[in-house]
């Protein structure tokens, strides 16, 4: 149903950064959760009859290249929601298995899955929460996205001043600039 998978130049950069900063178990946690999340989207898109052209690993993560323009707003909402729902359902199952076997790796995997899913529900482009908001209220989505990105930048700067690192501030800055440019 799709032509294949490719890694864009930005995807190689993302892989390099992840490999530099993460150990192998952490890399497996990130890759596994992203895979489960994207499989949720693929499952729903296929149920909706959408042709998947390809999967592309870019600088912003794994992207499904397809034409959703023919989907109704309700169906677009469901396709956007499917990724986070798969992630949360998987996290619940993996968490139960981790607790039963007292397996710290499975608990870490489950926790990362919840974080990825909740983060993806934020109403800021290009995340799934934005796609859901755009499907529900198309006129408001760009404004809510920009305000959310600005809020992330302000919170990130506050966290940075308080000594909690620069990651959230840079993420907020990226999202603000992405909305403006």
Name each model-derived stretch.
Residues 1-181:
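Hydrophobic transmembrane alpha-helices and their immediate loop junctions
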